[in-house]
């Protein structure tokens, strides 16, 4: 009853002040799931999105996160070259999403690395990352620059995603490879009363 009342209050116009209070508490008492996220890139408040107080979102003005998302503890989102996360995405703990890498440039420039402007560094890898609606990213997965992951996917725990992943794929391993389909995984559940009508992609079923 108490939890239900708190939920109703949060979903009222008081949602933003409650979010700000939770965010403050989360910085003092970590880890803590903070309800609500202000999407700077879209200038919209995502009331149903929940992000851990220990998650690090760098350059978050270049990070777009849809509503109903979940980002768990100690995950890192490098927004320097843009991240777009669709609605309903869940991201496990210790996940890394990277949009740049200096793994080539540091050798090419040697001791001059810091003296060279980032935009002028040879071998400096950049690429935005996109994650489609209702995709699940397992704990410890790493997503590298330039990758596009489709909708309705499952990225297994510990996977290293180096290339694009099509819609409804299950990907695992390092480097990650497609090992199955979430359509096949979900098919048995679609016979449960009311589930087929709620399925996120009606065209797929």
Name the predicted role of every residue range.
Residues 147, 158-159, 165, 174:
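Short beta-to-alpha loop/turn elements within the nucleotide-binding domains of ABC transporters
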Residues 53-64, 70-145, 174-175, 181-183:
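Flexible, glycine/small-residue-enriched loop-and-beta-strand segment within the central core
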């Amino acid at each position: 009853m108490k939890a239900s009342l708190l939920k109703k209050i949060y979903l009222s116009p008081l949602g933003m002040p409650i979010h700000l209070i939770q965010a403050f508490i989360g910085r003092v008492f970590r880890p803590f799931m903070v309800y609500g996220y202000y999407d700077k890139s879209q200038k919209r408040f995502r009331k149903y999105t929940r992000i851990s107080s220990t998650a690090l979102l760098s350059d978050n003005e270049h990070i777009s996160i849809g509503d109903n998302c979940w980002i768990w503890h100690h995950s890192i989102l490098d927004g320097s070259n843009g991240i777009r996360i669709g609605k309903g995405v869940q991201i496990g703990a210790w996940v890394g999403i990277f949009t740049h890498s200096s793994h080539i440039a540091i050798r090419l420039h040697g001791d001059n690395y810091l003296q060279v402007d980032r935009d002028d560094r040879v071998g400096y890898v950049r690429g935005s990352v996109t994650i489609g609606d209702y995709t699940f990213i397992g704990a410890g997965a790493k997503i590298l620059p330039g990758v596009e992951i489709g909708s309705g996917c499952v990225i297994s725990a510990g996977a290293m995603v180096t290339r694009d992943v099509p819609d409804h794929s299950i990907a695992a391993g390092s480097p990650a490879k497609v090992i199955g389909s979430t359509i096949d995984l979900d098919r048995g559940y679609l016979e449960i009363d009311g589930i087929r009508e709620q399925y996120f992609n009606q065209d797929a079923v």
